[in-house]
């Protein structure tokens, strides 16, 4: 035969078998099949083709051609991404059918070279196996087979030496190949898979094609975004076609016996459908209308039936629903307080939270004490005293009592409360550890306290309140069993079945057909009531019953039919949140055995999918299933099916029959961790997708998933069938292998019927008992190199990037790390085997580990640590946190509840116990739970139920008798505010006056209600609301019509903004992050004086926000000068000067501005807060900067016409720059601002885990914009790959970039113009009764009567532009010393204009005529006469005019009057010595010298009195050729430049430090050819060499250095 003939024959054979081999190529023999009779012939054809190509083909490596002509064993390479980026090319492996003994003796290809790793000690590059103490035989767990890499290697290589296999990663990104150890090398290590064969446990059935190839590490085929593991979505789902789930429905008749064996594993009642046996008359059952007989041996389960050899009768009571608590309620009852919190419990009081640092650096503060409202005669003024900041509150209380000794009864206990609130300060706290103290000092106020009786506040309500049970919110379930409907349907079924049997006995064909249809209709109605689920066995038994031909068959099938109905009802009740169930036919008690004795494999069947959504039916043609096992977020094993499944309409409603079977042979049952979860996902092929172009890569998308624990809440392994709702995936699919048991929640959710194997025993996971203690080792006993390397790993604090060798090293040295609290996450992340035998060792080291800081313990609440004892240990550490930490972390605690496996958990107990600390915690926990109940009831019902049950448990067990009433009144207040807002929005055509009138009318009704029953505000429950200040309330001008409400209290008012149809969870989260950043800064001694305010979401898209008083937006400030104000750089500084009329107040406001502006620059940059414009940046009159409106964050930038409006890292404008520097030239204040920014930024970088853990916990909260991508965004913004010095350089450059950007100004202008167009009449409208340069009105009574005023002279000032000011002397009656004020001619004009407007008949005039330029000396000289005449005429008017409030306001002293030399050149007061900040660092390992050039100050002016343009040069002398010259950038026009640049010298041996000198010089860049040296200093590098070397091999010399002036 010629070569052409052989090739032609091969092609023809390939064409004949191409369709049959498509599945083989995509599955690659990975599917367990029951062979058909044609299998030998098919194999012969395959071998024939192989022989032909082996004889003529040059080899697979050089093969090219189409698939139709390819060899039968050739597989095309599908370049489809797996779970994240894979750096190496891959192809799907060929899987050979070998058991573990065969695989163990097979040479394996070596692993790809690992990525570069940091240097580590040589002796630990291939660490030896750790020594492990022998375990008791009872706890011995056979080692599992290794978990190989997720993708195989295609190239072949010689065998490699045997080394311990690295641990399996918790992420799907490991690339290590498996290796197998000999028996002599066996060891028991929890971080290494067991590398031995298990012939005794492997299924050695003759059907070798049914084995799952575990030589290839399982790649999870869910292709979903799994939080905390994957870093990017996998866009390819084509790998689902390469499956290995067994499709039982695809077998031919010859394999029916094998199918029956599999089905019996899941259903002991299974009867083969191919059995020819017929029921005998002796085994017949009584008529259906009797319903009485002895019960069957075991309840039926959906999916099969057990062969019954005796008569069965069903009592009528077996089909009646009975009341019974569901499993969730039983778990909730077990929640209890564990006494974890070692603090005083005061559940009847509001106690202010305290911090573990001092809120101020002051040593003493002024405290003013008042008597609270409870005293009958409370007319005494407050009494002041000076208290030390570190003094205890009980001592201060005693001092306060001594001030009121004669006025107070002595038989009561007293305490100090926050002024105006019913919130006591903790008696054992320090004055400086109370946040209220810092709040008062932040606003420049005295610390005002109320003295009151420390006793529960008894509240009397005048109206009768409704029952709590009628008021409390309940999650509405659309699929909870309706008892009446089900029982009525069953009654109809019994009637129709009786009619059918009568027709059957009569033999009437017409009646039989009619009654048969009615029975089907009733069953269809029953299935429709129960979520549209139609179990296949139920439908088949109904068909058999209606197709019976003999009486014996009728009786037999009737009872089978009823058994299936009973099983269906019982299972549905268990799978919904129902308080009903159906009594079992018989209670069967199985013996209980520990899972440690079970060497079997886990077996699961996927039966079918029901309640198919309409869009699935219309948009998808085929469906594929994936079945994975998870421990936390670590994949243990998995299967997927390659055979497409389609929607069938043969059973009442559309369904997807699956009939898929999986047997997990990677691990034995005894080796699965306690927290193992089963995750099932479904994907679909899009209809009419372009599959012709790529037949092997159709458009497949993931549609939904469900997750269920392997063990129930009592730690018994699940058995039998389950109804599981599939969570529909949204636009951004996310698989969550954690959380509560999924209950059926919505009639629209598809339902999966999944079955576990039914065992003869109840299998439970035993309690882990520590029978021995570990002995901690001294960290100092390790060699220095290992210590340094471990400390570096701990300092990095990144558990997700640990290399294999790092994991080995950390686990081996775990006993040396017990005194390093920060190392515990690294140790636990290095452990990959969490089976029974290995968790004992983890629990041993937990007992000896150093106490964790609460910030570290937060990480263990993440789902990647599912072990219940690990989480309980974390809760114990959290309980040691300060009350302020616990209070502000309540949202994270409640979010972490969604990661708990069961309702009863240590975290749930901890939250319950927190609610009893004080009423502050009680109300905060209640409303945090409430908002999640409302938001999650639709998309995450199990979590919503969990929150609601905990909420109910807290309310029922709380000791405060008025709690339920208080909460009910809060709900009523919120409903009333919602009603008012809806009323205003419904009248969109009303004018502003009409809208305000309607608001005040409704608020008047609310005010009367509050007078009867005072309400605790949800946002501030310690505030007793007694009414509303109606005249101060208003409506904000936006589409949602948010309300500004000012509530009246006993001693103070409380202002809020109430919003509806606006998700305020984003704003609340940003404020939480801001509070955490502020806590980090203050605990490190950096107080940036940040203004924080409360945001409280109280339900679905509604909430309250605290209003900050005495503030204005930047737009409101700019509007004072009209549209041109947005272009005025001085507008903000003038506004601050106007509101701070003395020098001390202005300097304090300027300091507040510098600090808070630096803080908000950091916050907005790190969190990526966008949509920044001049209407959401605010300034208080005390100088604090703060932002509002956080709808755009985490890189979600505001867009306009397709362009990004936010072009800068953060908003830092020239207006802010002018406030900081008192003008346009950089000063020392600018250096201070930059230092604050860089210090704050580096503090956050060092505490990154505190921030990132909060983000990780909230990543699954469904808050818009918060996900794992936002975590990556924050980590990227923190520049974690840079050193502190490099980060300082980068952030300084960003400050300059933001300041120099023109886009911010353009954005402000565009927003201002838009506001001007929408509100033109009221835009920049000035108050005619006030002067623009004085914020308040002053009168004769406040300032004293003016007797005479005299214009003395005029002076030229720079503010900062040139202006002529008139100095006026003011004499007041009975005041010996006159005062001086400085006013411009424009201000005299403003006074004249407003006086004429108020008094039209006034005859006083002011000559304002000037020719051309008015701001010149000659014109100022002429105007002084006009001004003097104006003042003479003014004070000759009647008192009503000359002594009105406008006149006294004009002559009131302001800032420029108190400090007339504010704008005089500062050079006169400057030191003559120039200084420069340097940081010189030498690294002896890298042999590098780094010179960081920071600031320079006190540079001299140039000869022409101009500001210099400095830059810095450095040399390492001696250097005759100046080859070592390096220089910084030029800083223009300043005597106080900031460089913040790092200059580096490489290849710098340590030996030459002794002979070298660092020369640093400051130069002025006068032009291209005009440059001269201004200052110079020389630093011998010997000083650096003499310094001690740090742990990182660095010697550092830093500080301010004096420079010598060059002549």
Curated annotation (Swiss-Prot):
Its record classes its membrane topology as:
Peripheral membrane protein
Which CDD domains would you find in this protein's record?
C2A_PI3K_class_II, C2B_PI3K_class_II, PI3Ka_II, PI3Kc_II
Cystines in this chain: none
Positions of the region Catalytic loop?
1168-1176
One Pfam match, given by its short name, reads PI3Ka
Record-listed E.C. numbers: 2.7.1.137
Domain PX: where? 1344-1458
In alphabetical order, the GO MF annotations are: 1-phosphatidylinositol-3-kinase activity; 1-phosphatidylinositol-4-phosphate 3-kinase activity; phosphatidylinositol binding
For this protein, the record's SMART domains field holds: C2, PI3K_C2, PI3K_rbd, PI3Ka, PI3Kc, PX
Coarse class of the protein's main subcellular location: other
Q: What class of enzyme is it?
A: transferase
Q: Where in the cell is it found?
A: Cell projection, Phagocytic cup; Cytoplasmic vesicle, Phagosome membrane; Cytoplasm
Q: Where is the PI3K/PI4K catalytic domain?
A: 1029-1303
**Family recorded in the similarity comment:** Belongs to the PI3/PI4-kinase family.
Tell me, in a sentence or two, what this protein's role is. Answer: Phosphatidylinositol 3-kinase involved in clearance of apoptotic cell corpses by phagosomes. Phagosome maturation requires two sequential and non-overlapping pulses of phosphatidylinositol-3-phosphate (PI3P) on the vesicle surface which mediates recruitment of sortins snx-1 and lst-4 and small GTPases rab-5, rab-2 and rab-7. The first pulse is initiated by piki-1, then maintained by vps-34 which also produces the second pulse. Unlike vps-34, not involved in the formation of PI3P in early endosomes.
Question: Any idea what this protein is called?
Answer: Phosphatidylinositol 3-kinase piki-1
Provenance organism: Caenorhabditis elegans
Name of the gene this protein is made from? piki-1
């Amino acid at each position: 035969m010629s070569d052409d003939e052989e090739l032609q024959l091969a092609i023809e054979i390939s064409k004949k078998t191409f369709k049959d081999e498509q599945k083989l190529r995509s599955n690659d023999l990975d599917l367990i099949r029951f062979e058909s009779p044609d299998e030998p012939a098919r194999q012969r054809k395959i071998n024939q083709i192989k022989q032909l190509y082996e004889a003529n083909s040059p080899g697979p490596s050089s093969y090219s051609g189409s698939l139709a002509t390819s060899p039968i064993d050739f597989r095309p390479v599908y370049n489809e991404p797996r779970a994240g980026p894979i750096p190496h090319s891959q192809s799907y492996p060929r899987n050979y059918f070998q058991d573990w003994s065969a695989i163990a003796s097979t040479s394996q290809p070596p692993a790809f070279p690992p990525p570069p790793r940091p240097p580590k000690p040589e002796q630990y590059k291939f660490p030896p196996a750790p020594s492990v103490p022998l375990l008791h035989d009872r706890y011995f767990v056979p080692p599992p087979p290794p978990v190989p890499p997720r993708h195989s290697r295609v190239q072949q290589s010689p065998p490699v030496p045997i080394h311990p296999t690295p641990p399996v990663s918790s992420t799907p990104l490991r690339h290590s190949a498996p290796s197998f150890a000999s028996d002599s090398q066996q060891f028991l290590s929890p971080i290494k898979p067991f590398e031995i064969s298990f012939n005794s446990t492997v299924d050695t059935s003759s059907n070798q094609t049914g084995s799952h190839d575990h030589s290839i590490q399982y790649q999870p085929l869910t292709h979903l975004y799994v939080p905390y593991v994957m870093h990017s979505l996998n866009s390819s789902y084509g790998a689902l076609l390469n499956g290995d789930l067994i499709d039982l429905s695809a077998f031919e008749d010859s394999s029916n016996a094998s199918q029956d064996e599999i089905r019996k594993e899941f259903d002991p009642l299974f009867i083969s459908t191919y059995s020819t046996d017929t029921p005998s008359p002796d085994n017949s059952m009584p008529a259906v209308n009797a319903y009485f007989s002895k019960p069957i041996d075991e309840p039926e389960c959906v999916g099969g039936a057990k062969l019954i050899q005796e008569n069965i009768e069903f009592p009528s009571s077996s089909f009646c629903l009975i009341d019974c608590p569901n499993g969730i309620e039983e778990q909730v009852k077990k929640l209890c307080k564990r006494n974890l919190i070692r603090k005083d419990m005061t559940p009847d009081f509001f106690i202010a939270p305290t911090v573990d640092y001092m809120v101020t650096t002051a040593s003493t503060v002024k405290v003013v004490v008042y008597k609270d409202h409870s005293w009958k005669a409370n007319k005494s003024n407050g009494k002041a005293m000076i208290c030390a900041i570190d003094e205890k509150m009980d001592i201060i209380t005693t001092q306060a009592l001594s001030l009121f000794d004669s006025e107070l009864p002595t038989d009561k206990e007293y305490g100090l409360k926050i002024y105006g609130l019913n919130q006591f300060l903790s008696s054992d706290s320090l004055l400086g550890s109370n946040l209220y103290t810092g709040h008062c000092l932040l606003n420049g106020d005295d610390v005002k306290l109320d003295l009151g009786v420390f006793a529960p506040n008894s509240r009397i309500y005048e109206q009768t309140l409704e029952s709590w049970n009628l008021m409390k919110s309940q999650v509405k379930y659309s699929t909870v069993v309706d008892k009446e409907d089900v029982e009525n349907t069953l009654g109809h079924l019994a009637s129709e079945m009786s009619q059918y049997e009568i027709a059957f006995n009569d033999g009437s064909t017409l009646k039989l057909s009619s009654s048969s249809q009615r029975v089907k209709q009733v069953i269809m109605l029953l299935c429709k009531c129960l979520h549209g689920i139609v179990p296949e066995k139920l439908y088949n038994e109904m068909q058999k019953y209606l197709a019976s031909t003999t009486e014996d068959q009728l009786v037999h099938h009737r009872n089978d039919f009823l058994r299936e109905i009973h099983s269906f009802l019982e299972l549905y009740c268990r799978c919904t949140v129902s308080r009903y169930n159906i009594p079992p036919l018989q209670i069967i008690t199985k013996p209980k055995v520990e899972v440690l004795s079970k060497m079997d494999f886990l077996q699961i069947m996927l039966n079918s999918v029901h309640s198919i959504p309409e869009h699935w039916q219309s948009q998808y043609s085929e469906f594929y299933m994936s079945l994975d096992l998870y421990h936390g977020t670590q994949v243990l094993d998995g299967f997927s099916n390659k055979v497409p499944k389609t929607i069938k309409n043969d059973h009442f409603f559309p369904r997807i029959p699956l009939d898929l079977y999986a047997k997990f042979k990677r691990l034995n049952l005894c080796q699965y961790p306690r927290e193992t979860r089963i995750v099932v996902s479904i994907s679909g092929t899009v209809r009419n997708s372009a599959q012709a172009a790529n037949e092997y890569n159709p458009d497949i998308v993931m549609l939904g998933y469900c997750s269920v624990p392997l063990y129930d809440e009592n730690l018994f392994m699940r058995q039998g069938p389950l109804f599981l709702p599939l969570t529909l995936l949204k636009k951004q699919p996310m698989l969550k292998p954690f959380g509560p048991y999924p209950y059926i929640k919505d009639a629209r959710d598809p339902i999966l019927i999944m079955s576990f194997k039914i065992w003869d025993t109840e299998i439970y996971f035993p309690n882990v008992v520590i029978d021995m203690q570990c002995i901690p080792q001294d960290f100092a006993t390790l060699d220095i190199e290992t210590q340094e390397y471990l400390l570096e790993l701990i300092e990095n604090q990144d558990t997700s990037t640990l290399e294999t060798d790092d994991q080995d090293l950390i686990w081996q040295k775990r006993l040396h790390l017990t005194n390093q609290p920060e190392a515990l996450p690294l140790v636990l992340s290095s452990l990959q085997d969490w089976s029974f035998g290995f968790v004992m060792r983890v629990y041993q080291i937990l007992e000896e580990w150093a106490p964790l800081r609460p910030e570290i313990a937060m990480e263990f609440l993440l789902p990647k640590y599912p072990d219940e004892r690990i989480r309980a240990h974390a809760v114990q550490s959290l309980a040691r946190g300060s009350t302020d930490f616990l209070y502000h972390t309540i949202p994270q605690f409640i979010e972490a509840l969604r990661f708990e496996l069961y309702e009863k958990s240590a975290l749930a107990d901890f939250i319950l116990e927190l609610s009893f600390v004080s009423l502050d915690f009680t109300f905060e926990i209640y409303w945090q739970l409430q908002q999640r109940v409302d938001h999650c009831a639709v998309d995450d019902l199990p979590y919503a139920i969990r929150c609601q049950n905990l909420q109910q448990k807290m309310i029922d067990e709380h000791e405060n008798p008025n709690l339920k009433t208080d909460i009910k009144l809060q709900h009523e207040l919120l409903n009333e505010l919602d009603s008012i807002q809806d009323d205003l929005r419904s009248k969109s055509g009303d004018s502003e006056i009409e809208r305000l009138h309607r608001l005040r009318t409704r608020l008047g009704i609310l005010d009367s209600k509050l007078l009867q029953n005072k309400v605790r505000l949800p946002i501030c429950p310690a505030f007793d609301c007694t009414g509303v200040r109606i005249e101060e309330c208003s409506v904000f001008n936006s589409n949602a019509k948010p309300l500004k409400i000012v509530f009246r209290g006993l001693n103070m008012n409380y202002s809020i903004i109430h919003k509806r149809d606006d998700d305020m969870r984003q704003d609340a989260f940003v404020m939480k992050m801001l509070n955490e950043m502020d806590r980090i800064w203050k605990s490190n001694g950096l107080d940036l004086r940040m203004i924080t305010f409360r945001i409280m979401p109280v339900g679905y898209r509604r909430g309250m926000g605290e209003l900050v008083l005495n503030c204005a937006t930047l737009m409101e400030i700019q509007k004072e000068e009209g549209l041109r104000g947005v272009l005025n750089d001085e507008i903000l500084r003038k506004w601050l000067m106007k509101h701070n009329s003395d020098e001390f107040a202005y300097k304090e406001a300027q300091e507040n501005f510098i600090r808070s502006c630096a803080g908000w620059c950091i916050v907005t940059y790190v969190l990526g807060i966008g949509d920044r414009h001049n209407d959401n940046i605010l300034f208080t009159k005390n100088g604090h900067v703060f932002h509002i409106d956080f709808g755009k964050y985490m890189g979600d930038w505001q867009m306009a016409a397709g362009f990004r409006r936010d072009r800068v890292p953060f908003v830092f404008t020239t207006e802010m720059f002018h406030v900081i520097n008192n003008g346009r030239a950089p000063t020392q204040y600018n250096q201070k601002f930059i230092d604050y920014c860089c210090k704050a930024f580096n503090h956050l970088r060092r505490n990154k885990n505190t921030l990132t853990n909060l983000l990780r916990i909230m990543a699954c909260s469904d808050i818009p914009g918060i996900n794992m991508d936002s975590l990556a965004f924050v980590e990227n913004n923190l520049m974690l790959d840079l050193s502190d010095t490099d980060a300082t350089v980068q952030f300084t450059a960003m400050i300059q970039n933001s300041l120099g950007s023109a886009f911010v100004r353009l954005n402000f202008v565009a927003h201002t113009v838009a506001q001007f167009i929408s509100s033109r009449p009221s835009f920049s409208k000035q108050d005619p009764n006030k002067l623009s340069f004085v914020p308040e009105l002053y009168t004769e009574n406040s300032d004293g009567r003016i007797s005479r005023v005299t214009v003395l002279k005029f002076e030229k000032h720079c503010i900062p532009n040139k202006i002529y000011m008139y100095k006026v002397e003011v004499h007041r009656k009975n005041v010996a010393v006159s005062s001086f004020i400085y006013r411009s001619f424009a201000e005299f004009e403003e006074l004249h204009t407003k006086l004429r407007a108020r008094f039209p008949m006034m005859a006083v005039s002011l000559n304002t005529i000037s020719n051309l330029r008015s701001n010149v000396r000659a014109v100022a000289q002429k105007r002084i006469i006009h001004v003097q005449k104006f003042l003479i005429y003014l004070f000759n008017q009647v008192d009503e005019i000359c002594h009105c409030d406008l006149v006294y306001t004009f002559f009131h002293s302001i800032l420029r009057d108190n400090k007339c030399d504010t704008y005089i050149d500062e050079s006169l007061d400057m030191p003559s010595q120039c200084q420069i900040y340097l940081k010189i660092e030498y690294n002896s390992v890298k042999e590098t010298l780094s010179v960081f050039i920071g600031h320079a100050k006190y540079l001299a002016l140039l000869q022409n009195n101009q500001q210099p343009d400095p830059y810095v040069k450095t040399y390492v002398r001696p250097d005759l050729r100046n080859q070592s010259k390096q220089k910084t950038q030029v800083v223009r026009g300043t005597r106080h430049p900031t460089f913040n640049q790092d200059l580096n010298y490489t290849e710098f041996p340590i030996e030459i430090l002794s002979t070298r000198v660092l020369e640093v010089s400051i130069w002025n860049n006068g032009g291209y050819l005009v440059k001269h040296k201004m200052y110079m200093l020389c630093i011998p590098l010997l000083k650096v060499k003499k310094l001690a070397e740090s742990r990182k091999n660095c010697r550092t010399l830093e500080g301010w250095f004096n420079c010598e002036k060059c002549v």
